[in-house]
């Protein structure tokens, strides 16, 4: 067989490596039987030597596979731990009247909401960034706001003797704080610090929907859930345990305008008031937007006409070069 291969190589390559015509070479190769002529090129030998994986490579691939599987399991475990917050109820989206593009706040509801804050919320929560003058023209007249401010005593001074004194509140005074400092607030609320309500609606995900759901979402803890003393179950609060007792209930107060003081009505009014406190420029911003749209309706056709009849002439103008003769 080796002799046959040598003779065939000699026939194909010829003397001194000279090749024969392609047709003759192909004919000789095709006439040879596979069993009689086991030719192996260098490329085939190289591929056959790499077809099998060594023991070290197999061990490395196995280790990488186990590492990938472990990483996937760890990622799933961490994802499950992070998704534990899904146990908290997400507040639904309520149809607030001021959510339209051109809708304003209900100022009657703002007035009732301020009454709720004054009689229910102000005993624990402060509003450091809202003054009595901000109520003028929104839900109270100037005289009414002055009367409200005069009901509180504000520390002022020093006087001529260098001493601080108390005086009736004025329009430029801000709402009084229920506690002198945060330490006193924590001491009076079992270690919990009541948040400031000036920007509470803008500071919470969900806005007024979250505040409304929190105020009306108190319920008994489910079976198997135990709370320590001083905490209340609320599914909308992170952790479901809140230190604030249910602040509102039906007929907790009487509105000045005679509106029935149901729990949902009280929560709706105080949320509207807190929405205004978080964004006092709400109505002004929408009025400016409406004025801008009206101005744009007049300016856009004018600009389009100028572009078509003035700029298009300049844009389509061509310059021709005429060399001097």
From Swiss-Prot:
Component of the ubiquinol-cytochrome c oxidoreductase, a multisubunit transmembrane complex that is part of the mitochondrial electron transport chain which drives oxidative phosphorylation. The gene is CYC1. Belongs to the cytochrome c family. Residues 1-84 form a transit peptide. Heme c binds at residues 121, 124-125, 244. It is found in: Mitochondrion inner membrane. The keyword Repeat does not apply. This is Cytochrome c1, heme protein, mitochondrial. It comes from Homo sapiens (Human). Residues 108-209 form the Cytochrome c domain. Its cofactor is heme c. The chain crosses the membrane at residues 282-315.
């Amino acid at each position: 067989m080796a002799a046959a291969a040598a003779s065939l190589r000699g026939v194909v390559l010829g003397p001194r490596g000279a090749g024969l015509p392609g047709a003759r070479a192909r004919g000789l190769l095709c006439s040879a039987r596979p069993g009689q002529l086991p030719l192996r090129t260098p490329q085939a030998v190289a591929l056959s030597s790499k077809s099998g994986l060594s023991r070290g490579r197999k061990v490395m691939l196995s280790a990488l596979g186990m590492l990938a599987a472990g990483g996937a399991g760890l990622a799933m475990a961490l994802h499950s731990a992070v998704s534990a917050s899904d146990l908290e109820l997400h507040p639904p989206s309520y149809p607030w009247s001021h959510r339209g593009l051109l809708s304003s706040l209900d100022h009657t509801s703002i007035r009732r909401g301020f009454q709720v804050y004054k009689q229910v919320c102000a005993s624990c929560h402060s509003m450091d960034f809202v003054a009595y003058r901000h109520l003028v023209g929104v839900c109270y007249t100037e005289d009414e706001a002055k009367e409200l401010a005069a009901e509180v005593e504000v520390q002022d001074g020093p006087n001529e003797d260098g001493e601080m004194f108390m005086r009736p509140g004025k329009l430029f005074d801000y709402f009084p704080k229920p506690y002198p400092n945060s330490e006193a607030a924590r001491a009076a609320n079992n270690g919990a610090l009541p948040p400031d309500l000036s920007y509470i609606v803008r500071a919470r995900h969900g806005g007024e929907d979250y505040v409304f759901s929190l105020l009306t979402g108190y319920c008994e803890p489910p079976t198997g859930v135990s709370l320590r003393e001083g905490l209340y179950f609320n599914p909308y609060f992170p952790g479901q345990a809140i230190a604030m007792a249910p602040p509102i209930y039906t007929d907790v107060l009487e509105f000045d305008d005679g509106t029935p003081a149901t729990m949902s009505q009280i929560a709706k009014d105080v949320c509207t008031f807190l929405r205004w406190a978080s964004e006092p420029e709400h109505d002004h911003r929408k009025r400016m937007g409406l004025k801008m749209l009206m101005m744009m309706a007049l300016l856009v056709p004018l600009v389009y006409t100028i572009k078509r009849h003035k700029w298009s002439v300049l844009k389509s103008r061509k310059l021709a070069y005429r060399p001097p003769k």
